[in-house]
Amino acid sequence: GKTTLPELCRTEKMTTKFNDSYPSDFSMQNNDQILEAIEHYLGQIGYPEEPGRLYAPISYSLTMSGRRLRPMLLMLTCGIFSDQPQAAMPAAAAVEVFHNFTLLHDDIMDNAAMRRGNPSVFAKWGQNVAILSGDAMLISAYRLLSEYPPQVLPQILARFTTMAIEVCEGLQYDMDIEPRES
């Protein structure tokens, strides 16, 4: 049968190689510490320098000042069910990378010049680069999820893929309701 989210969060199978990189006093009660851990983890993803026109927009997008609400909620939710919530960090990072991928494509669809008070990737590098960098971010999100052990990976990938499709469906419904500028 399918494993439920609480079961995924509290199982020892969720242990990843990243658990050892957290301080022993890591607390899910301290939102600033969680946010700092998320920022640190995102900074450690390590995109190559070349080709620069592919990876620079990804780094630019991920370093814009966002609230990191999605990964924060994922970490807090997993913390309810587990005494090792840091095991959820690869999934939290994948959700944030995926979210930023959707923003790159959304800016293209909206013809948006600005994102979070900065020039959008679309405005700064152009449509083709924004599409390709966004696509690389989507693939990178799946690569982050691949860090999980094979015992839980199929369930995690299935849930993530369902979420990704639902986000795309939501964007399409949004376009159907509110015509975009051409």
Locate predicted features:
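Polybasic, lysine-rich low-complexity intrinsically disordered segments
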Residues: 2-3, 13-14
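N-terminal amphipathic/basic leader segments beginning at the initiator methionine
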Residues: 18-45
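Mg2+-dependent prenyl diphosphate-binding active-site environment of isoprenoid biosynthetic enzymes
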Residues: 43, 47-182
